[in-house]
Amino acid sequence: NNYCKICPKGTHTLCKYGTSMKPNCGGKIVKSYGVTNDEKNEIVKRHNEFRQKVAQGLETRGNPGPQPPAKNMNLLVWNDELAKIAQTWANQCNFGHDQCRNTAKYPVGQNVAIASTTGNSYQTMSYLIKMWEDEVKDYNPHKDLMHNNFSKVGHYTQMVWGKTKEIGCGSVKYIENKWHTHYLVCNYGPAGNYMNQPVYERK
């Protein structure tokens, strides 16, 4: 397993859990796992539409807004390797970030989201991604990332990180204490959220 050699510190998710592609969720009742083709398209479309909106200077929210337009906003494409790593982590039903998810090609960033409902349905991909988009309301474009409150804006900044080119996500839906929970993990390459770099180049 070459993934065991990739990470200088921490254990790679595929090194640690890569032998099984089945959920390992303890007492949680797993209803479904994986990302359908429709969901895959929804994830990529939703990301690219939002990236374009920000790049064109049409995002009015912020602390303060609006967000400045961008000149280097790559269009994201789906990457199956990133998705496999994301799915393997999602399958652990352990909300938070894994230790290492890099590939031989590049370091990899990550967004995670979780939402529960008491009804019989699960929140959609778009609902979870919108939670990341909405963090823009707390982002101050006049300060660098280091001087923003990273815990409040880090999902937004990875979503619109100009140099990121590829995305791959994993998802698991489970029931716990009658709560219908949807857990989404998206991996991004090359990674964003470097404290000493701009989120994107400005026009």
Swiss-Prot record:
Protein name: Venom allergen 5
Keyword Secreted: yes
Broad class of the protein's primary localization: secreted
Disulfide bond listed as a keyword: yes
A GO CC annotation given for this chain: extracellular region
UniProt source species: Dolichovespula arenaria
Keyword field: Allergen, Disulfide bond, Secreted
Subcellular location: Secreted
Domain (SCP): residue spans on this chain: 45-188
Pfam families associated with the record: CAP (PF00188)
Taxonomy, superkingdom: Eukaryota
Covalent S-S links between cysteines: C4-C15, C7-C100, C25-C93, C169-C186
Tissues and organs where the protein is expressed, per its UniProt entry: Expressed by the venom gland.
InterPro entries xref list: Allrgn_V5/Tpx1_CS (IPR018244), CAP_dom (IPR014044), CAP_sf (IPR035940), CRISP-related (IPR001283), V5_allergen-like (IPR002413)
Family assignment from sequence similarity: Belongs to the CRISP family. Venom allergen 5-like subfamily.
